[in-house]
Amino acid sequence: MGRDAIGVGVLGYGWISRAHVHALHSLNHIAPLPKRIRLVSIGGRRAEPLEAAARELGFERWTTSWEELVDDPDVHVVANCLALEGHAAPSIAALGRGKPVLCEKPLGGDAAEARAMWEAAEESGVTNACGFNYRYVPAVTLAKQVVGEGRLGDLRH
């Protein structure tokens, strides 16, 4: 792959993955970027729907092995849109290979997994970001305010 493109690998082929891919497609058209976005590989568990998603979404290839996607030299960044149990291991592996990761929320199943992801990013010097796409939605902002003011009483979680 030439230096004119950023190769993206996406883990998962559900609705949130499709939202990420739509945003990635848009990046090539909304502004003059120094590099274009190239959809290299999409990964998941089941071959038949994965192959259909790859074709529909415009990926060059697909794989049922997250290891293969993370190890692919044409994949420069990884968007991890798998279910929660698929967040930590692939993200840590990608970060360990120096590939930035955008992982859907929550980062891990517990604080230890999230910390391991953070440590992998720190050690490799690349970004591990979490998709907090609802953070500034008015309803969420209002809920935070109501909880913060104690208007709902003493909450437990």
What are these regions (language model features)?
Residues 8-10, 80, 103:
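Hydrophobic Val/Ile/Leu positions in short beta-strands of Rossmann-like dinucleotide-binding domains
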Residues 16, 134-157:
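Predominantly a Rossmann-like dinucleotide-binding segment in NAD(P)-dependent oxidoreductases
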Residues 40, 60, 74-76, 156:
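Conserved acidic residues
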Residues 60-66:
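Conserved SAM-binding strand-loop segment of SAM-dependent methyltransferases
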Residues 77, 84, 88-135, 150:
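Beta-strand-loop-alpha-helix segment that lines the small-molecule cofactor/substrate pocket
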